[in-house]
Swiss-Prot record:
CDD domains: Anticodon_Ia_Met, MetRS_core, tRNA_bind_EcMetRS_like
Keyword Transmembrane helix included in the entry's annotation: no
Protein name per UniProt: Methionine--tRNA ligase
EC number: 6.1.1.10
Protein's organism: Bdellovibrio bacteriovorus (strain ATCC 15356 / DSM 50701 / NCIMB 9529 / HD100)
Residues that bind ATP: K332
Gene: metG
Length: 687
């Protein structure tokens, strides 16, 4: 009989218009703990995630940066995957909802909805811009917040007071593109008849959600469920709905959960299998990890979609709480709204993994990242209790003795046996996602080992009883090894270093049954060092400064008048103008459309950026451009620009510059890189 479980787990998809922050990591880390634990136990656990890439906010952010939505999501994908990798989150596959697999799935689901008579059309009134001849998504509408009076806020939520509302509730409403007042106009929308699945969902939710989530979700069932508008009007970055002549697009909350399946399909293809081989396999367990703010989408809308398309639903939806910092909501002004990359600039990722594991349970309660407690617990527990065992025992054996273990003494054997018997209890806590309880038992074993080591005081018996001393150290190192095995789901790299110290391969759960004796160990390498308070302060300060810059940029954008043309430069006199040239002279200048592939600051230069630009036909040019004061490198990546490609290459102090990027302005921060319309292709000549 094969007891190996087949498991598929997913996390909510991070949105591709922003960075990963410490709040996001509450979810991704706990899912990673659980996936690693399952694989350690010999189960096959596939861990799937993807970037959520569609919707109006993506369009707006790309427009602000002057790049295409595709370039924005490519940039986010690179940043997100790097952040996850550096935090040791090990996905089986990380995809994107902007994939062919996802488009085909959306169309398939929609077809099944139609075949089951689960859709209907109805005209609804929406804001329409007569100037731009288009319906306006919420993010293309600006006005005064109806709650706090803040001006130039988007049509769905206020950046100042965080209120949500309808665009029709706002005052001084105008199109964010041209500044004109919109009118109300009918648009035919497509609705999913959610109430068709009311009885099914009432039975499904209690079986697949925790009691506290079930109770909350079933409050929606006191009356008929409202049909869900699954369509959005153009312009929209997403998938066009079949049969609408590219005028209607799937709402992002339709294609986002499909991303679980399309990314699973991509992984399945890499294994020579199909989506149905994985998703429809009745022996495979499927679990969703999500935050409580999106529980409704995953426990009402998503199961109904799956039922309509005749796909199985997940075994369980695991819902967690949010992150508080120092007992309060994450704050941008206080610097506690911390990006993953900001944390990584200052601290070891395993320290946060450890701290979160001491806080997380299977409940939906929020967890608190108290920065003082974080520092103290890492220093006293991970460094002082756990790592110190390996450090003291390993270094004494290697430096004071011959570097070879002996056998545990009688008391040590009992200590090790007790630690082994704790395995199933710790495993049960991991299985139940009660990570804090698992860590509590692990710390208890560390306390036992430290008490044993201190009472035996091997540093005192080294000369008088070398063999007895070696037995004490052997016991201590075996206990340290077991702690590293128990901690592997939480601290995978740390565990690998312990295995290397003891000359072993990567640990699996069954290695707990083994006791090391008469083994030569390797040189001890530092596994964890104390956190300095100054590093935590520096991290918070960096977070505060970054968020100040972001808020200043938002404020500048919100106070800027839509569609206002730049102030004209002072009129030049006839004598200031260059002499006229013949067309043949102008024709000598070869201007082409290029796309910025890479951009980086030249730290030694105040004004220069180093750009790598694709000018077509497989040619990548390096161009050194004096636009540093006006643009950050990340604002340029993916952008289509105008390039003079036949300018004679110029050897500069910082490398060869092979062309010129065209920009307008007076210089310094008053520079504006010239861009091409969306239809222009890389390599095309400007005429």
């Amino acid at each position: 009989m094969n007891d190996k479980r087949k498991i598929l787990i997913t996390c909510a998809l991070p949105y591709a218009n922003g960075y990963i922050h410490l709040g996001h990591l509450v979810e991704y880390l706990q899912a990673d703990f659980w996936a690693r634990f399952q694989n350690m136990r010999g189960n096959e656990c596939v861990f799937i995630c993807a970037d959520d890439t569609h919707g109006t906010p993506i369009m707006v952010k790309a427009r602000e940066l002057g790049i295409t939505p595709e370039a924005l999501i490519a940039q986010s994908y690179k940043e997100h995957t790097q952040d996850f990798a550096d935090f040791q989150v090990q996905f089986s596959h990380f995809g994107s909802t902007n994939s062919e697999e996802n488009r085909l799935l959306c169309e398939y689901f929609y077809k099944k909805m139609q075949e089951g008579n689960h859709t209907r059309s109805q005209p609804i009134q929406q804001m329409y811009c007569n100037h731009d001849k288009m319906f306006l998504p919420d993010r293309f509408v600006k006005g005064t917040c109806p709650k706090c009076g803040a001006k130039e806020q988007y049509g769905d939520s206020c950046d100042v007071c965080a209120s949500t509302y309808s665009p029709s509730d706002m005052k001084d409403v105008h199109c964010s593109l041209c500044g004109t007042a919109p009118v109300m106009k009918d648009s035919e929308s497509i609705f999913f008849k959610l109430n068709d699945f009311k009885q099914y969902l009432e039975e499904w939710i209690p079986k697949h959600c925790s009691p506290e989530i079930s109770k909350k979700m079933l409050e929606w069932f006191n009356e008929d469920l409202k049909d869900l508008d699954i369509s959005r009007d153009e312009p929209y970055f997403g998938f066009a709905i079949p049969g609408t002549n590219n005028k209607k697009f799937f709402y992002v909350w339709v294609d986002a959960p499909m991303g679980y399946m399309s990314t699973t399909e991509q992984w399945a293809k890499s294994q020579g299998k199909t989506l149905k081989d994985i998703w429809q396999d009745p022996s495979r367990e499927i679990y969703h990890f999500i935050g409580k703010d999106i529980a409704r989408f995953h426990t009402i809308f998503w199961p109904a979609f799956l039922k309509a398309a005749e796909f199985r639903s997940p075994n369980q939806v695991f819902v967690h709480g949010h992150l508080m910092v120092n007992g309060e909501k994450m704050s941008k002004s206080k610097g506690t709204f911390i990006a993953a990359r900001t944390y990584l600039n200052h601290l070891n990722p395993e320290y946060l993994r450890y701290y979160y594991s001491t806080k997380l349970s299977s409940s939906v309660d929020d967890i608190d990242l108290n920065l003082e407690d974080f520092t103290n617990r890492v220093n006293s527990e991970l460094v002082g209790k756990i790592t110190n065992l390996g450090s003291r025992g390993g270094q004494m054996l290697k430096k004071k003795m011959d570097g070879k273990m002996s056998v545990p003494d009688a008391e040590g054997k009992k200590l090790i046996e007790h630690a082994q018997k704790t395995a199933e209890s710790i495993a049960a806590h991991y299985e139940a996602r009660d990570f804090a309880k698992a860590l509590g038992e692990i710390r208890g074993l560390a306390d036992d080992a430290n008490k044993y080591f201190d009472e035996k005081a091997p540093w005192k018996t080294l000369e008088a009883d070398p063999e007895g001393t070696k037995q004490v150290i052997t016991t201590t190192l075996n206990m340290f090894r077991m702690l590293a095995i128990y901690l592997k789901p939480v601290l995978p790299f740390y565990s690998q270093k312990v295995a290397k110290l003891l000359g072993e391969k990567d640990y699996v759960w069954s290695d707990l049954n083994t006791v090391l004796t008469n083994r030569e160990i390797n040189d001890y390498e530092h596994l964890a060092t104390r956190i300095e308070a100054d590093k935590v302060k520096a991290m918070v300060e960096e977070g505060r400064k970054i968020n100040e810059e972001i808020q200043a940029a938002k404020k500048a954008a919100s106070t800027a008048k839509p569609a206002a043309a730049p102030a004209p430069a002072a009129a030049a006199t006839a004598g200031d103008r260059p002499a006229e040239i013949e067309f043949a002279d102008f024709d000598k200048v070869d201007l082409r459309i290029g796309q910025v592939i890479e951009a980086e600051e030249i730290k030694e230069a105040d004004k220069l950026l180093r750009l790598k630009i694709d000018i077509g036909e497989g040619q990548i040019r390096q161009i050194i451009s004096g636009i540093k004061a006006a643009y950050k490198p990340e604002q340029l990546v993916g952008r289509k620009v105008l390039v003079c490609v036949n300018l004679k290459p110029r050897k500069m102090k910082f490398g060869m510059s092979e062309g010129m990027v065209l920009a307008a302005g007076t210089g310094g921060s008053d520079l504006f890189v010239l861009s091409a319309d969306d239809g222009a292709q890389v390599g095309q000549r400007v005429k």
